[in-house]
């Protein structure tokens, strides 16, 4: 959502009980939410309590490079007015995005800000939850990683819309009728070892051929629309 997303919802008259920060870049929605509560006459601490209790942060990336951090100079250029609207000194605002408040060498991390403004924090698998607890351990000084409130959910997919029809037919044939209604049953999945390698390979080959035909069709369509170089187009198509 972000700051603009909250403004758009407000314009539409939409109010929700829970706000989900899906990755750190969405966390600035909590800046606007804090400001809105302050404008209603609440103190900063009261506003923060309401924002936290109704905030959920989901992280997906288990490597530091996937968590945005901003140099103070760049961040202040765009966000200084928001600190003023929150009634915070610039240092206090920066500290909301620092693992170690007061460390002036530390950049502003949107992930840290999300953790500080959301009551619930989760990874997207059991293992990722454990990794995230260790990654974020410095945010909650004095606690062991496993004592933090970083939890997890297990990401899944909707099988009927995720699996192409060719795989669905193979699964139905080899797994039985009960598979569609009990996809988490590992005993059913074990039946994959009884499927002939040739059957799996032929399915893969058929799907790959189908994909290549699709790519060629889309590429040709794009070339016609944009009036591309014919020789270049044919060279690419022949090379696929």
Task: Describe each region flagged by the PLM.
Residues 1-240:
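Catalytic cores of carbohydrate-active enzymes across secretory and cytosolic contexts
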